[in-house]
């Protein structure tokens, strides 16, 4: 288990670097006169796929956001299932602290956003934008502190982020679903039933689940619910345990996907969506209720919610601090959780899917600026509270 956590952290740290590079490239390409037009043409390039009579025609940007991101959510589904069955969320005692922290880290940012936007019926639909945490960026910053970071603090952050991702998935399903096309929803229900049947029959071939998953993705895409949810559903049904000692299909697929997601899908998503055209940006609008609400949610709501609910859960005796971790370290890492970036941008695109380009631009700017500041403040806070290297808690051998 410790070995798996180390591998995950190392991969996410490298992914964080890739994300930063992709973001810088996107901003450069979108604003440099030599590449700006080509960048937009690349994203708007039409891509058509046919499956018999079925035709799906979208531009490249939407294929990245609806198609490739479904693979990212498949990985999340696999990770959540593993943690729930045999990982850091497998028991009530283990799960309570990160669960409480994650709930606080979603509710409080939304409340802070609404403080600025509750009276604006156009912008208040973005209340969930600051509720997300970008685990790759957060882990990337955490690893800059090396062996000073206790293993228990890393596990806490990973568990919190996994629950946070699950919360974001539920928010997308419940609050950002457009008009339902019922025949397609019926097809999605049948596809889920087929996945359940495969699981119950203990089918071990991952390809069988993925084929049904493609059908599910198409049905969900057509019915009006966001298609990326298909990935999570498929991940939950792929078997984790085997009775005859064979390799776990879920763990095998998870390991196979991690590199592709970390080094291709998420950086490509960042490259496609972080290219904000800075020309024409009005400073007054940068301090609009939308941008300020996002910044307040990420920079104040996140750490406040995580800290308060963590303290309350420990105080009431429902959980205890991880071994070798002080409460000041929980407070410091809560600041780091204000890095919203990819998931916050993803929810922005859903919240303002009507196509208001100006709202999306200023929301993205708020996310980028707040996430960058959260990364800096979180790093400085952790550097101040973590033990010096010679006194650091040594990681467990695994």
From Swiss-Prot:
Supply the gene name.
nhaA
Q: Give the GO molecular function terms.
A: sodium:proton antiporter activity
Residues folding into a coiled coil are none
Q: Native species of this protein?
A: Pectobacterium carotovorum subsp. carotovorum (strain PC1)
The Gene Ontology biological process terms listed for this entry are: regulation of pH
Free-text function comment from the UniProt entry: Na(+)/H(+) antiporter that extrudes sodium in exchange for external protons.
Q: How does it sit in the membrane?
A: Multi-pass membrane protein
> Where would you find this protein in the cell?
Cell inner membrane
Annotated PANTHER family: NA(+)_H(+) ANTIPORTER NHAA, SODIUM ION/PROTON ANTIPORTER NHAA-RELATED
Q: Where are the transmembrane segments?
A: 14-34, 60-80, 96-116, 125-145, 155-175, 179-199, 214-234, 263-283, 292-312, 330-350, 362-382
Keyword terms of this UniProt record: Antiport, Cell inner membrane, Cell membrane, Ion transport, Membrane, Sodium, Sodium transport, Transmembrane, Transmembrane helix, Transport
What's the protein here called? Na(+)/H(+) antiporter NhaA
User: Which cysteine pairs are covalently linked by disulfides here?
Assistant: none
């Amino acid at each position: 288990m410790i070995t798996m956590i180390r591998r995950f952290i190392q991969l996410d740290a490298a992914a964080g670097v890739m994300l930063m590079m992709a973001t810088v490239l996107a901003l450069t390409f979108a604003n440099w006169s030599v590449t700006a037009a080509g960048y937009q043409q690349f994203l708007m390039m039409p891509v058509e796929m046919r499956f018999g009579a079925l035709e799906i025609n979208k531009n490249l940007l939407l294929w990245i956001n609806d198609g490739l991101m479904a693979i990212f959510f498949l990985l999340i589904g696999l990770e959540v299932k593993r943690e729930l069955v045999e990982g850091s969320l497998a028991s009530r005692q283990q799960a309570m602290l990160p669960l409480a922290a994650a709930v606080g880290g979603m509710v409080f940012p939304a409340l802070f956003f609404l403080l600025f936007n509750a009276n604006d019926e156009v912008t208040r639909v973005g209340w969930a934008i600051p509720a997300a945490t970008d685990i790759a960026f957060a882990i990337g910053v955490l690893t800059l502190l090396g062996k000073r970071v206790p293993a228990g603090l890393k596990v806490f952050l990973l568990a919190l982020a996994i629950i946070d991702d699950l919360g974001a998935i539920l928010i997308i399903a419940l609050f950002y679903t457009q008009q339902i096309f019922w025949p397609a929803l019926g097809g999605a229900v049948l596809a889920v039933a087929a996945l359940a049947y495969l699981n119950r029959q203990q089918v071990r071939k991952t390809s069988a689940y993925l084929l049904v998953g493609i059908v599910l993705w198409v049905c969900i895409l057509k019915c009006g619910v966001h298609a990326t949810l298909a990935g999570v559903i498929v991940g939950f049904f792929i078997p984790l345990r085997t009775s005859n000692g064979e390799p776990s299909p879920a763990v095998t697929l998870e390991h196979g996907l991690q590199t592709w997601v970390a080094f291709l899908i998420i950086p490509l998503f960042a490259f496609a969506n972080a290219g904000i055209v800075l020309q024409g940006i009005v400073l007054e609008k940068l301090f609009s209720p939308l941008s300020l609400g996002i910044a307040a949610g990420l920079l104040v709501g996140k750490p406040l919610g995580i800290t308060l609910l963590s303290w309350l859960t420990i105080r009431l005796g429902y959980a205890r601090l991880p071994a070798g971790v002080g409460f000041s370290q929980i407070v410091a890492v809560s600041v780091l959780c204000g890095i919203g970036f990819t998931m916050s941008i993803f929810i922005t695109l859903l919240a303002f899917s009507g196509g208001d380009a100006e709202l999306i631009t200023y929301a993205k700017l708020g996310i980028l600026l707040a996430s960058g500041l959260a990364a800096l403040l979180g790093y400085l806070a952790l550097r101040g509270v973590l033990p010096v290297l010679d006194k650091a808690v040594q990681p467990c051998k695994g």
